[in-house]
Amino acid sequence: MACEAFYTLTMDYQRLLDKIRLRSTELGFTGIGVAEAELQADQAHLQDWLDQGQHGQMDYMARHGDMRSRPDLLQAGTLSVISVRMDYGADDLQAWQTLNSPASAYVARYALGRDYHKLMRQRLKRLAEFIEHEIGAFNYRVLVDSAPSLERALARNAGLGWIGKHTCLIDKDSGSWFFLGEIYTDLPLPRSNEKPQGHCGTCTRCIDVCPTQAIVAPNRLDARRCISYLTIEHRGSIPEELRAPIGNRIFGCDDCQLVCPWNKFAKIHAEPDFAARNNLDQASLLDLMAWTEEEFLSRTEGSAIRRTGYINWLRNLAVAIGNAEPSAAHLAALNEKTAHPDPVVREHAEWGLRRLESKLRA
């Protein structure tokens, strides 16, 4: 114990942090900073959001009390949080082309490749092991959206960007197309000195473009109206008034990021695991609707898409096909699903069928 105390007192933590930064770059992280383990002001903002019921069915957001804003409650002894960024930017032109092609399926960019949770967790674990190699055993916990944590607030405090009006983190040199992850540590690492100020100014492009008006105020997202929530987290029937605005977005939505002026500086990712799988960046609605449950499970293995489940996958596709142009193939696909054993699938297939038929009569 005495040796450990002496080692701690004589540790050059700035030199250690410099080494951590270098190793993080080698592991594919595109930004890194250190935040203090205190987020009480952000906890108040979260609680107000919860009190308004704007988290929808995401009951897990209301659990754990102050644990999100008190990292030391989640990982005992936490003194500082290493926050990292990994870019997943791609060509915006293809995204717009898909959105403007009603018969095509739009899958949010982050979900086209391998599940980022698994990839980043592995890389963060390797970063923690590097630290252990440098200084010996220390207490830490790796997080990638896997425990109660205010990751955007931590990243902001670590100097990685500011929280934009669409509630995503923005870096003035890299935009907002990136994932976040953390290592909670008991090391007194030097804190990031620069806390980026907001640079959204009077811009409201993200608010204006939202198909369902889910951004109800700057920095305020009503998840109950958000297409990402509706197509991924929400279980059961999608409110009927929100189905048409969903368009052909079958898993998530990127509109608020696609229009953000800061994303002209976004970096195109160089991570092979983020490349689109199973042709998901140019698949037709009909092709995906034809997947059996076995095909869905097989083709979404290792993908974030599996989170939504097969029933909600069919539900989302039924809505999207209903929003497409009427064709014999679209009508036939929906008609087949009106006999599906699940009532949610039947309901949305029937809605889509009525919508296509109304377009034919118009």
Model-derived segments and spans:
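Short coil turns that connect the paired helices of HEAT/ARM alpha-solenoid repeats
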Residues: 306-308, 336-344
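Positions within the helices of HEAT/ARM-like alpha-solenoid repeats
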Residues: 313, 344-346
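Auxiliary alpha/beta "docking" domains used to position bulky ligands
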Residues: 10-199
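Amphipathic alpha-helical scaffolding segments comprising HEAT/armadillo-like alpha-solenoid repeats
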Residues: 296-299, 326-338, 359-362
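C-terminal amphipathic alpha-helical segment
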Residues: 239-273, 298, 302, 306, ...
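Iron-sulfur cluster-binding cysteine motifs and their immediate structural context
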Residues: 29, 205-229, 249-273, 333
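Conserved hydrophobic register position within alpha-solenoid helical repeats
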Residues: 317-318, 349-350
